[in-house]
């Protein structure tokens, strides 16, 4: 962490939007900040590109079928199931449906299905709050050529010790040469900066041009914007 150069963009004034970080039912309480952090950029993608990449992928991998298939490791069944990926019309997308899609996407990425099974109330993000967050995203001037949930990976590097690293960049603005990591948290931590450094390491080692990239950590809830850089030899 100490190798990172972190610069705050003072043009973005701290201004907090309150969004619950948990959701509950009569069985459990689950943290949802990560889901919210996927949902807002995804809605922004839908607005500027008229597509929802994660929805398309979930349909292609038949995620709903995965949810209803018994496995030895995850034999849990959903408590209640109001939504279905295959039946959601993204042209009429509600915040509740958006959050369900993003919960499924998060499960698809990390391989853990328990939050899809356990979360039944997708009511923590109102349309009004979502709209306010989208305004903040718009202020970033992200172009419509950008890629969202952009898959990157790397292997065969000496320091990886035969490991294969895989991650999803929140947003890759190819026109502006900016890679974004978005958060929806009350306070940024070292881990958030290190996550962006992780993507920096992968991308800088894999890129085939001399293009200078900017790496930005943006906390949607607080409107905090930080540019992160590092000597490539120290990543």
Residue map of PLM features:
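Glycine-centered tight beta-turn/hairpin loop motif at sheet-sheet or coil-to-beta transitions
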Residues: 164-166, 175-177, 223
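Metal-dependent nuclease catalytic cores in nucleic-acid-processing enzymes
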Residues: 191-221
């Amino acid at each position: 962490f100490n190798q990172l150069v972190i610069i705050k963009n003072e043009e973005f004034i701290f201004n907090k939007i309150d969004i619950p970080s948990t959701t509950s039912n009569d069985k459990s309480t689950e943290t949802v900040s990560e889901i919210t952090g996927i949902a807002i950029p995804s809605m922004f993608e839908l607005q500027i590109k008229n597509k929802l990449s994660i929805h398309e992928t979930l349909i292609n991998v038949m995620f709903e079928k995965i949810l209803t298939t018994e496995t030895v490791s995850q034999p849990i069944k959903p408590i209640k199931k109001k939504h279905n990926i295959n039946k959601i019309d993204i042209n009429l997308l509600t915040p509740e449906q958006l959050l369900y899609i993003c919960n499924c996407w998060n499960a698809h990425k990390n391989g853990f299905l328990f939050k899809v099974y356990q979360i039944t109330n997708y009511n923590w993000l109102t349309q009004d709050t979502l709209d306010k967050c989208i305004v903040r995203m718009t202020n970033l001037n992200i172009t419509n050529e950008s890629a969202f949930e952009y898959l990157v990976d790397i292997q065969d590097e000496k320091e990886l010790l035969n490991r294969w690293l895989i991650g999803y960049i929140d947003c890759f603005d190819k026109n502006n040469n900016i890679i974004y990591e978005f958060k929806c948290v009350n306070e940024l931590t070292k881990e958030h900066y290190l996550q962006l450094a992780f993507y920096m390491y992968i991308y800088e080692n894999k890129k085939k041009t001399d293009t200078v990239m900017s790496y930005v950590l943006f906390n949607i809830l607080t409107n905090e914007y930080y540019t992160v850089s590092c000597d490539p030899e120290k990543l």
